[in-house]
């Protein structure tokens, strides 16, 4: 990165899924977790579902609103899978506002 001088600096490290995702074997080389878009189940470790910032979820941003929508879709998918039913394809949406 070189040498930088600043009176105030906001340093943000490279982002990736949390250490628990790597330890569970659900994160790939990108540092994120590839998922099935219908069930939100890990493509690397079947039986583990990943939501929120850790998930590679298409065009969904890394936001709490997106994670909330993913959580509801994931719960519905898990409930369907437990009944041996085919999960419905979720219609994930996002609303994100920045007041800055």
Which positions does each model-derived feature cover?
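Central beta-strand plus flanking loop segment that forms part of the substrate or channel wall
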Residues: 19-21, 94-99
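FAD-site-proximal beta/loop scaffold in flavoenzymes
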Residues: 4-69
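Active-site lining segments that contact anionic ligands and/or coordinate catalytic metals
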Residues: 45-46, 93-95
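A conserved FAD-binding loop/helix module that cradles the flavin
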Residues: 54-92, 98
